[in-house]
Amino acid sequence: MGFHHVALAAADMEATHIFYTEAMGFELVKAVVAPTPDGGWAKHLFYDTGGSKGLIAFWELHDDALPPVRGGISTAVGFPEWVNHLAFDPIDAEHYEMCKKRWLDLGADVVEIDHGFCTSIYAVDPDGTLVEWCLDTRTLDEQDRAHAASALFDPAPALEDPPVPDFHLADPSVTPPWKR
């Protein structure tokens, strides 16, 4: 069973829309505009991620009873951006490379990491949420499951070597469209 959608509040819906349509290639497919419980109103905007079933949605909130949106899903609660993040599944290796090129062409710096079982590229959305394209490079097997089960409740598990990031810097003369 998958998920239907993940919903996040956006501080700047225009910048968020530009990022998720132009940089991610997602399509806006549904909007629900309704009152909020405390007398304001909100737009709930749904984007098709282009993969299997599963949407991402953003709230544009117009309600003085609610606090302003502050930071990404990780930094807003005091964690570094790498802790809470969004990871999307590219169609294949060609799509993964196309996503990396698109981010760089649009002016976004990209971090790439080979995790051993998957390879990932990372960029940051307008609210400061880390966004990832994660390409599986091998099938998880019984050895992976056994390791996960033993690590789950081990108070002092053996540490693995940290992955080495590869930094792809965008042309500094290009301003990402969601930052204009």
Predicted regions and their residues:
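Vicinal oxygen chelate
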Residues: 3-11, 46-50, 69-180
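Core segments of cupin and vicinal oxygen chelate
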Residues: 9-60
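Short Gly/Pro-enriched turn/cap motifs at secondary-structure boundaries
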Residues: 35, 77, 111-112
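Short, acidic Gly/Pro/Ser/Thr-rich loop/turn segments
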Residues: 54, 65-66, 138-140
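A broadly used, surface-exposed interaction patch
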Residues: 58, 65-70
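Histidine- and/or cysteine-centered catalytic micro-motif in compact active-site loops
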Residues: 61-63, 91
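A compositional/structural signature marking long, glycine- and acidic/polar-rich segments
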Residues: 63-64, 78
